Amino acid sequence: MTSPTFIRLRFAFKLSFAIVAALFLGFHLQLETPRWSVLTAAIVAAGPAFAAGGEPFSGAIRHRGWLRIIGTFIGCIGGLIIIVLTIRAPVLTLMLCCLWAGVCTWISSLVRVENSYAFGLAGYTALIIIVTTGETPLLTPQFAVERCSEIVLGIVCAVMADLLFSPRSIKQDIDRLVDKVLLDQYRLLQLCIRPAEKTDIDRAWNDLVKNTTALNGMRSYLMMESSRWQRCNRRLQVLHTESLTLITQACETYLVLANHPDILTAELKAMLSEPAPTPAEIHQRMKTLRQFIAVSHSEAIPHTISSWVGAATRYLLLAKGIHTNSSISRVEEGILAGVVPVKHVSAEGHHAMINGLRTGVATAIGGLFWLWTGWTSGAGCMVMIAVVTSLAMRTPNPRMVAIDFLLGVIMALPIGALYFMFIIPATQQSMLLLCISLGLLAFIIGIEVQKRRLGSLGTLASTINIMVLSNPMEFNVSLFLDSALGQIVGCFVSLIVLLLIRDNAKDRTGRTLLNRFVYSAVSALTTNKARRNENHLPALYQQLNQLLMMFPGDIDKYRLALTLIIAHQRLNKTEVPVNAELSAFHKQIRYTADRVINAKNSQKRRYYFARLLQELDQYQQKLVDYQSPDAVTRPVKRLADMLHKYQSALI
């Protein structure tokens, strides 16, 4: 029952059932174009499977369904507004729709990746409505309502198929990953105190950052499964912070030991070096370490080690609650209430603008070419351009997504022709035969989708789209060929646009991210208690993960970013003297660091960065004048030296 083959076959059957149910109910309820409900069921069920490379979790399917509903409704409302305002000017209507698609793509590039699908869908939904009702604009409201109804029906069928045939809960995977992350955290600390080779440590913390990010991403899917996981969701949110704290403290321990190898006593090092292959054994180790720290002198225990043990203790307490989903205790409530996460602003503003420009320009060119030539395949081509350019932009490799779509529509032509010209006409007298034939196609492609076969998802969606499943069915070969040709040309044009309009914002975005790490470090210099209690770690590590995705082979950037995160944490824990002059200087330093981020050109950025270094030198002198202890002056000096050393990478 748990073998990979059985799981693949089970999902393929789920996909077939969802598509067949949407087809049957679409005809039974007398919907005008059941194709949309069938296509929605296929995309909602198969999309997460292609992304996961296997059977998706129930929460992923429902999350995808909700995003499709939201995107469809936003797109329908946008299309209706454009039609109402410009009904007497068809060309202006089409150009406004292209602008709408570009704006939606721009927004989808700024929001969280898991929610970007809704805005991409909203962009091309409005275009589909306007293109479809171009000759009868007065019927646009009716078409929008019908499309929304068909979309909702397809989503209901996909969710029901998952519920009926053994839904896959994400909870067990969360439990396993929670334990794995804890074990990996302990191993990372052991590597840092040994110390091991830099490459081994880099690999260990890189994997931990990815697993911690993945664990946090599972929360939304868990909440989509059932409301009874609310307590787990709260614990997971704080567990994410504790895991990031453990990574930071372990890496800071490595840096401290590199400069002061004798700071760790032999007894403490021996205790930390003892193996602990299970969470239960780590729990026992933490008990022993807490007792040892309690009876030891405070100066005998490095601050990073005591902080690591404290974070690991909180992690263990939260992990136990996640496994059992029990009521939140008073101690846990104190931990949960003490975390105030800070949301970060996207650093991909320029990248998002390029994405919106690609979609807007590509759809506008397709629309003008359609209006100029009167090409019968122009509408389908224009819609396909919008679909590909909207959905590909937020992926790590948009060009490969466009190629996937192109291969899919090419494969859909012979498969769709076989069904449209031979199989479907032969099953017109029997709904059962029609459902079996379409279900068989879905079953075969459902297996390939889980293998992430290039072109498989595009083949499924494109084949359903060109079959023109309408009520009543009309077998117009010319219409079929126009639709198929429009899809192929649209995907090809989209690929050409992606290749011609290059995104050169990668280096700029990477530099912006690094300068944001600098800003977070200097902003920790504050006497404001509310600001010091803010939790920046999730936002900082989210930006670090983004840096990992953008520059997968540049280990120097990761080390610099991680060192700046460590500097932020160290300065945030430093007791800065309360002084009006120092507080005013803190504001000035933050302002200068912000100007470095928002500088319009390299000359201004270089000027403000030099000013920031000068202000940090002045700040160090003020700390000396006010006789601040070494615990305050040393971290500030370390940060200033780091910025001097790596200024070429930051400007």
Curated annotation (Swiss-Prot):
<feature type="transmembrane region" description="Helical">
    <location>
        <begin position="429"/>
        <end position="449"/>
    </location>
</feature>
<dbReference type="InterPro" id="IPR023706">
    <property type="entry name" value="PHBA_efflux_pump_AaeB"/>
</dbReference>
<keyword id="KW-0812">Transmembrane</keyword>
<feature type="transmembrane region" description="Helical">
    <location>
        <begin position="11"/>
        <end position="31"/>
    </location>
</feature>
<dbReference type="GO" id="GO:0046942">
    <property type="term" value="P:carboxylic acid transport"/>
</dbReference>
<dbReference type="InterPro" id="IPR006726">
    <property type="entry name" value="PHBA_efflux_AaeB/fusaric-R"/>
</dbReference>
<keyword id="KW-0997">Cell inner membrane</keyword>
<comment type="function">
    <text>Forms an efflux pump with AaeA. Could function as a metabolic relief valve, allowing to eliminate certain compounds when they accumulate to high levels in the cell.</text>
</comment>
<feature type="transmembrane region" description="Helical">
    <location>
        <begin position="41"/>
        <end position="61"/>
    </location>
</feature>
<keyword id="KW-1133">Transmembrane helix</keyword>
<feature type="transmembrane region" description="Helical">
    <location>
        <begin position="67"/>
        <end position="87"/>
    </location>
</feature>
<comment type="similarity">
    <text>Belongs to the aromatic acid exporter ArAE (TC 2.A.85) family.</text>
</comment>
<feature type="transmembrane region" description="Helical">
    <location>
        <begin position="119"/>
        <end position="139"/>
    </location>
</feature>
<dbReference type="Pfam" id="PF04632">
    <property type="entry name" value="FUSC"/>
</dbReference>
<feature type="transmembrane region" description="Helical">
    <location>
        <begin position="481"/>
        <end position="501"/>
    </location>
</feature>
<protein>
    <recommendedName>
        <fullName>p-hydroxybenzoic acid efflux pump subunit AaeB</fullName>
    </recommendedName>
</protein>
<keyword id="KW-0472">Membrane</keyword>
<keyword id="KW-1003">Cell membrane</keyword>
<dbReference type="GO" id="GO:0005886">
    <property type="term" value="C:plasma membrane"/>
</dbReference>
<feature type="transmembrane region" description="Helical">
    <location>
        <begin position="460"/>
        <end position="480"/>
    </location>
</feature>
<feature type="transmembrane region" description="Helical">
    <location>
        <begin position="405"/>
        <end position="425"/>
    </location>
</feature>
<feature type="transmembrane region" description="Helical">
    <location>
        <begin position="368"/>
        <end position="388"/>
    </location>
</feature>
<feature type="transmembrane region" description="Helical">
    <location>
        <begin position="91"/>
        <end position="111"/>
    </location>
</feature>
<feature type="transmembrane region" description="Helical">
    <location>
        <begin position="150"/>
        <end position="170"/>
    </location>
</feature>
<dbReference type="GO" id="GO:0022857">
    <property type="term" value="F:transmembrane transporter activity"/>
</dbReference>
<keyword id="KW-0813">Transport</keyword>
